[in-house]
């Protein structure tokens, strides 16, 4: 059942949709994470995978940064490999390493063995979403998933990779196997996001963390059609959709093609390597922008933070003047674990003042 709320006063939802928000909206990727002592206390008793499949922990961890920082959106606590695990792929998230796949996907037979995601396998996620929409008041909840390319990279490499050489070799040299893999992962991503939408999330974001390793030509040929199908399949729910990657300056136009044109508010995330004003010229008309403070800035002392935050807000306003339909303040990537939570709280307050 669709239990989504009406949130007409939400600055986040207003900015994405091209309406004038009451204030500059702000939230931060990985706002629920190791920067928070309350998060570390919970995680000391549970593995990452245990936490991602426990409705009580998902709910509590998602709420922690909203309580502490007063951000304008909550993002569901999860991990991009959760739907892979739920689909039966043997993997774990190893501390200080990341996702590790027990049996990497390297052949056409390996791809054929990938099973669809049954929605019942992510029931704890749906249960947590139902609770969260009842507890968040007027704060919207963002659901998310990893994009097919980034999931494919983890599966083919067997874990994090610097050069993604096996992934690119399959993509370029075994095209039929590659597209079969991307089709299977696109279906899994759609199923995971649909379960979140059906449970009541107010928006979705798709993370293509490793897309920046690709040339524009390769992205358009081997990735864009699959990512576009994710967004096209979810558009009927009517929720705003965001597409984010790291190091994707040359891909911003193509990434906006994937997320726009579906009849719902669309946004593209921008990292700190590209100004928001430049991004506005690269994305399709009708696209909002999210970003783009360098996460490391939050470690550099308050005078540096304040100066950089003001610069991002000003750049966001210039981007809107240049054609972006709205701006949501965020980091260019996730909050670093060493970040002082008080600095995050002060950053949120400063953005709200500007």
Swiss-Prot record:
Main location: cytoplasm
A GO BP entry: protoporphyrinogen IX biosynthetic process
GO CC terms of this entry: cytosol
Top-rank lineage group of the source organism: Bacteria
Pathway it works in: Porphyrin-containing compound metabolism; protoporphyrin-IX biosynthesis; coproporphyrinogen-III from 5-aminolevulinate: step 4/4
InterPro entries: UROD/MetE-like_sf (IPR038071), Uroporphyrinogen_deCO2ase_HemE (IPR006361), Uroporphyrinogen_deCOase (IPR000257)
Catalytic function, reaction form: uroporphyrinogen III + 4 H(+) = coproporphyrinogen III + 4 CO2
Short name of one Pfam family: URO-D
Annotated site, Transition state stabilizer, chain positions: 79
UniProt binding sites for substrate: 30-34, 79, 154, 209, 333
Record SUPFAM superfamilies: UROD/MetE-like (SSF51726)
EC number: 4.1.1.37
UniProt keyword Acetylation, yes or no: no
GO molecular function: uroporphyrinogen decarboxylase activity
Cleavable signal peptide: none
Cell compartments where the protein resides: Cytoplasm
Protein keywords: Cytoplasm, Decarboxylase, Lyase, Porphyrin biosynthesis
Function of the protein: Catalyzes the decarboxylation of four acetate groups of uroporphyrinogen-III to yield coproporphyrinogen-III.
Family: Belongs to the uroporphyrinogen decarboxylase family.
HAMAP family per UniProt: URO_D
Subunit field text: Homodimer.
Name under which the protein is recorded: Uroporphyrinogen decarboxylase
Source organism of this protein record: Mycolicibacterium vanbaalenii (strain DSM 7251 / JCM 13017 / BCRC 16820 / KCTC 9966 / NRRL B-24157 / PYR-1) (Mycobacterium vanbaalenii)
């Amino acid at each position: 059942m669709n239990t989504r709320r009406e949130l007409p006063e939400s600055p986040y939802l207003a900015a994405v949709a091209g309406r004038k928000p009451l204030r500059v909206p702000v939230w931060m990727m990985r706002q629920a994470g190791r920067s928070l002592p309350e998060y570390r206390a919970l995680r000391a008793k549970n593995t990452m995978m245990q936490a991602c499949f426990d409705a009580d922990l998902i709910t509590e961890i998602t709420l922690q940064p909203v309580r502490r920082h007063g951000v304008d959106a909550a993002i569901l606590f999860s991990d991009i490999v959760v739907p892979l695990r739920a689909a039966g792929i043997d993997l774990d998230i190893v501390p200080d390493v990341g996702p590790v796949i027990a049996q990497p996907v390297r052949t056409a037979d390996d791809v054929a063995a990938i099973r669809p995601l049954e929605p019942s396998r992510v029931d704890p996620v749906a249960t947590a979403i139902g609770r969260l929409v009842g507890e968040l008041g007027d704060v919207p909840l963002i659901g998310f998933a990893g994009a097919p390319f980034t999931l494919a990279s983890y599966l083919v490499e067997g874990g994090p990779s610097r050069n993604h050489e096996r992934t690119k070799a399959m993509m370029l040299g075994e095209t039929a196997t590659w597209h079969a893999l991307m089709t299977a992962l696109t279906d899994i991503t759609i199923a995971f996001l649909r379960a979140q939408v059906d449970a009541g999330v107010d928006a979705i974001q798709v993370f293509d963390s490793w897309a920046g390793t690709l040339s524009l030509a390769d992205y358009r040929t081997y990735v864009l059609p699959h990512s576009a199908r994710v967004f096209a399949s979810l558009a009927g729910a009517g929720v705003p959709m965001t597409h984010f990657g790291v190091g994707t300056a040359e891909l911003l136009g193509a990434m906006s093609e994937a997320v726009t044109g579906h009849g719902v508010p669309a946004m593209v995330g921008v990292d700190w390597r590209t100004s928001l004003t430049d991004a506005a010229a690269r994305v399709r008309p009708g696209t909002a922008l999210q970003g783009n403070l360098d996460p490391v800035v939050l470690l550099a002392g308050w005078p540096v933070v304040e100066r950089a935050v003001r610069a991002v807000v000003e750049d966001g306003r210039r981007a809107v003047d240049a054609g972006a339909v709205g701006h949501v303040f965020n980091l260019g990537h996730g909050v670093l674990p060493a970040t002082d939570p008080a600095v995050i709280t002060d950053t949120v307050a400063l953005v709200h003042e500007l």
